[in-house]
Amino acid sequence: DDSCAIGLVLAMAKGMVDSGYQPENDILFIAHGAEEWGASGTQFDWTTGAWEMINNAHPEWAGKTIAMINFELPAFYDGMSQGQISCVPEFSTLTKTFVETSGLLAEPVDAIYPEGISAESVDTNTMEDGVSYRASGVPYFINIPGTQEGEKGWIQQRYHTVADDRDTYSAQVMQTNLNTFGALAIYLDQTPALALDLNATCDDLQEALDTTLAGEDAQPYLDALDALRNAAQAHQEEIAAINAQYQDALDEKADQQTLDEIRERGRALNAKTLDAFRFVQEQFIGIISTSDIVIKHVAYQNNVDVIEGVIAALEEGVLSNEEGSGALDLAWMINGGAEYGYYSFSTETNAASLATLQEESNPGNLFWGTDKGSVLAQTYPATVSLLEKAESEDGDFTEEIAVYAKEQAQQERYLQEMIRQETDAMQELTQMLGA
């Protein structure tokens, strides 16, 4: 796991030094501490080393770091036919260009990935150090660590144990990741204007909205999104124009002063791009529980939808069925699955657990989860009651329906409020990009 990632970082640094590569930007090689655990009393207890690095040790990196490249299990082969690159959504266009047209990407070593490296990126998650940098406005990439699902898979049998030893090491995968991400670092370094595509942000905002649940707030949201999309596209065209001009200057063997002037324009635009990216993280990006990265209103939207299904099932008198549409088949999904704890543990245990998840009960101890959560639906009394009635076969669910209905209405109010906040934020971001 982590030892190979550190080895890869050091190998990349050595390769650049030994080759005489002269970067246009500062390139820092970092090994973070506390990647697996670094805090107590919080559900956001991992990647705290990275959080401390970007927030306290070097907060000046935020706003001028064009990319962070991270590694997880970079020498493990799980049988994939095609290698993949994971990144924030706004880097998906750059990834496609890098793979398809940059000319820098080498073929996988010994055809370890017989279908090569995919041009289609995969969105990142919260399970590694990149999430701490992203929260501070630093966009990032990471290799795709293999998992091998199922009880006999590598994750289940070896991950985070002494069985993650030398016989799990693949030199071909390690060298392929070194080649791929080393070339990506050079590609980023050599490109004057950072191709961080905010059209992807617009796509996520569009996909996130359930217009039916949003009701009368849907149209203002969509109108603001249309304006933002136009601004994002204009910004992307400005990025492309600078990079095209730079490439033309290189092809024409322009003098150094000309190249430096184009690069300076690129740096100025990069500052604007990174400001916009950080704004996106602060205003739009939420986290459900500690795992799902979503547009903020989705947490409430999901709750409204799930609770509606629970109420409908109770009105039919169905707690559980083979189709999975009974009230108890659905209720565990409330609050991003946090309700599931009540199926096995006491209310006291669940209260202690949830206190480590929420800002108001655990201030200053959420790290990369700060300002990313939502107000949870207080449906657990009804859920606990249903679990008890499932044992007694009591079929009167009037009181439980009332609890769920009340909390659904409250979640609807939070949903409306968050959609309106996001609408205002889209308008502000449009102005930022147009300035």
What are these regions (language model features)?
Residues D1-A435:
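Secretory-pathway/membrane protein signature
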